[in-house]
Regions:
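Conserved, single-site charged/polar hotspot
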Residues: 2-439
């Protein structure tokens, strides 16, 4: 009996070693984030240790950088240069350096033109193509603390949106895992490329959501792999099929009605853009436009726009191209901005009987003033009034939603949270054929 138990124990040990050796590896905790949002073309960078102690590795040497230490990195015209604290500037023998944390700390990074952004973790810098490439090496969960509050808002936790923040944390983590693998690939901090990441200074209530969902990601029912967890600000009341935006079919991101995104989101819920027929035409190399025709997807989003001028010349462009011509890049979002491809259009003639007493068309929704521009003098709501009247009319674009509309609508998630849905129910509504998993 003793011999049998011995062999049984030995067999169990061998089996356990086999299971451990063949288990799926967990995702790496440290990730690399290339800081391109504000530092993409930085020729001069200032770094300061704001908390903790760091080690500077430079030109095959190392030195300690206690809290308060400061570095300036630039270009001398023939080689990169560095200044450490108040020492003299010196030429770098190697065009790269690392700043590694000895203990838990923070680093402030800025260019002469921008305010400072503070990051956890380490920094690796290298001079490439006439600018400094700056990479933040940081724990993945700390990274998410700098993503969720800027992709959504810390204030949503107070307004009943705590579950929406959890849903955002899971979506952002899933996006991270899918795009970095086990940490071998870098991700950027840019919302135009990957996800918005703004470091320590934006951290707040959203960190609770990150902690509450730690390591949770969305995986596909069939493949068991992380999904493409796409999201945008506001779906306009109908999510879009991934194929119609990115060109590839995706069973996890399909088009469906989204009642939770209706009547929420301020300017994103309903926006209006006005442009004169001459300005619209000149934008696309045509004369004053007489007709605009829209080709749409089943969701109602515009697929392409056909523009025809008064001379019979026409041009057809994709909705994305059309929107980019008028999108308010770098400007505050407002209700008189062109925010997406979910829109209708109509033409209004510049007829005097359409004017309000103040001179501003009352039906356009503008705030009344004692003196206002005539409809014929409106060039566009982006440019404002013109000093010269034109008789060709204006086009009004009434739209809803903000962003591509694929996957989770952030405003819709917020509304669902306010209505009592939990983050798992929110994710289930927006992402098809998925389940939550911890790698």
């Amino acid at each position: 009996m003793t011999r049998i138990m011995y062999w049984f124990s030995f067999l169990c040990m061998i089996l356990s070693l086999f299971v451990l050796s063949t288990a799926k590896p967990c995702q790496a905790k440290e990730i690399s984030v290339e800081l391109v949002w504000k530092l993409g073309q930085a020729g001069w960078v200032e770094i300061q240790v704001t908390k903790g102690d760091y080690q500077l590795i430079i030109d095959a040497t190392s030195r300690k950088l206690p809290a308060g230490s400061r570095l300036q990195l630039g270009w001398a015209g023939w080689a990169p240069i560095v200044q450490i604290n108040h020492e003299e500037f010196r030429v770098l023998k190697e065009s790269k350096l690392e700043i590694k944390g000895i203990n838990s700390g923070n680093l402030s990074v800025k260019t002469p033109e921008d305010t400072a952004t503070v990051y956890r973790g380490d920094l690796a810098l290298s001079w490439q193509n006439s600018h400094w490439q700056v990479v933040n090496k940081v724990d993945s969960e700390d990274y998410l603390k700098g993503v969720v509050p800027i992709e959504m808002s810390n204030e949503w936790a107070i307004g009943g949106g705590a579950e929406a923040l959890k849903a955002q944390a899971v979506a952002a983590r899933t996006f991270l895992v899918r795009h970095t693998g086990n940490g071998e690939k870098a991700i950027t901090d840019s919302p135009d490329i990957d996800q918005a990441y703004a470091g320590v200074l934006v951290e707040g209530e959203a960190s609770v959501a990150v902690a509450a969902t730690r390591d949770e990601i969305l995986v596909d029912d069939q493949s068991k792999q992380p999904i493409e967890a796409l999201y945008s600000s506001h779906s306009g009341g109908y999510t879009e099929d991934a194929k119609n935006v990115w060109g590839n079919s995706d069973i996890n991101n399909v088009s469906h009605p989204d009642p939770y995104s209706e009547e929420v989101g301020g300017a994103a819920n309903h926006w209006r853009f006005i442009v004169s027929a001459p300005v619209l035409g000149s934008t696309f190399g045509l004369g004053p436009v007489s007709k605009v025709e829209l080709d749409k997807y089943p969701s109602g989003r515009v697929k392409s726009v056909r523009i025809e001028d008064g001379f019979g010349l026409s041009k057809t462009v994709t909705a994305r191209t059309f929107v980019k011509k008028f999108y308010p890049f770098g400007q505050p979002i407002q209700k008189f901005a062109f925010l997406g491809s979910f829109f209708e259009t109509r033409k209004i003639a510049t007829s005097p009987d359409l004017f309000s007493k103040s001179g501003l068309p009352a039906f356009l929704g503008f705030q009344e003033k004692e003196q206002g521009p005539l409809l014929s003098k409106i060039s566009s709501t982006a440019r404002g009034p013109s000093s010269v009247s034109q008789p060709f009319g204006v086009f009004i674009f009434d739209g809803r939603g903000w962003g591509h509309g694929v996957g989770m609508s952030q405003w819709g998630a917020y509304h669902m949270s306010q209505l009592g849905y939990n983050y798992k129910e929110i994710l289930s509504f927006y992402y098809n054929s998925t389940f939550l998993s911890k790698p």
